[in-house]
């Protein structure tokens, strides 16, 4: 078992599937995930039509997600929960309409080539920096593809490298947000939009709903600089350790039939056992589809791994790798 679970789980019969009328601060319920993660609605922002979900158990206890109200059906609430008046529900529906415009950015091979040139140039700088400053290399360490944890010296190297590039705040925010929930709030959405504009992935989703998504440290120019610098660091350290590609695994269970995976960021793992834990292949499983697969992937398509990312070794032990998926495999 790789994740915390309820000792005794309450029956779904005590709950009702979430609807807009349940978006009332204080309402308690659970996420409709496999382990029924409990929490409550802490607040609701009328302008963005997003609610704060405060988690009350498991690894992320005390932390919160920012969730669009349209996803309320992914939650369940106690049957005695407070409900909104119909007029307030209609107001939410009306406000949500302005966020239903879709933004589509297909993969551009021309933009991808330009970005790769930038990364190649930055990799030379990252390689020189690592040779001069890396505690990981000075201690004669290498990346062990069978390791269960990352390395503190490599965490430190990444941190110092990001400081030298003026990008540490982006690294910390991106790593923590991806660990907590990449679909919470709009920080990762902003990253995906910039990645798509750079040709790294495609973006096919809704327009941003928060005004500050591309302000402060999140301006597009700084986000792109971060994306290039991080890719360069990963390529440099893996190449210095003699790795051109890495063995990865992915496991998945779903309540819906399999569908084509788009060109986007995809979570994978270096551990076969972790991948198997995400694939409910036993006869008692109620999922409609599942799989687990092993594949080799070029280090050029890695975004984050547990080797250099401290946050990926704290609350969860999943030996995770986030990849730029460009339809080179069939999931």
Enumerate the language-model features and the residues they cover:
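Mono-ADP-ribosyltransferase
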Residues: 2-8, 12-13, 19-27, 43, ...
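Repeat-associated, polar segments at repeat-unit boundaries in modular proteins
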Residues: 66-83
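Basic/aromatic-rich interaction segments and small domains that mediate binding to polyanionic partners
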Residues: 25-69
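Amphipathic alpha-helical interaction segments
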Residues: 52, 59-61, 73, 137, ...
